[in-house]
Amino acid sequence: GVDLERINGFRSGFGDGMVEVMVVPMRKTERRQLYLDQIARFRRVSAVFAVSDYYAIDLMQFLGENGICVPADLAVAGFDGTPMSGLVFPALTTVRQDSGLRAKTALQKLRQLQEHQETQTTVTLPVTLVERASTRR
């Protein structure tokens, strides 16, 4: 799915062996247990890129509660560009995707399907990097 495409794109940008992937549970209690189990890993790496701002913000909260300072000890970035990303402390660096364009594109695709027109099954939308305090050292 989309998350796998993001991970593969990230890997291709950094090269083989430079990116470790952590599959994170959706349930918060299970996610927090995974974070606790992996705390040594968080102390070893220099940065984390989460597949969504939600997971990045959740991780930053966990890190702070466990004595790991963002960004001094670990840089954190997310994906979505949600309004919350600019309100947390430190403000989250994020890859923003225009949600209006995403909705417009989805509606166009649905109309094409309703009208039995051929349509692409995969659409790649432009993104913008919004650099904030969570990745500044």
Task: Give the location of each predicted region.
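Secondary-structure junction motif
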Residues: 1-12, 49, 56-57
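Conserved donor sugar-nucleotide recognition element shared by glycan-biosynthetic enzymes
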Residues: 2-6, 31, 99
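Flexible loop/turn connectors
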Residues: 18-19, 33-137
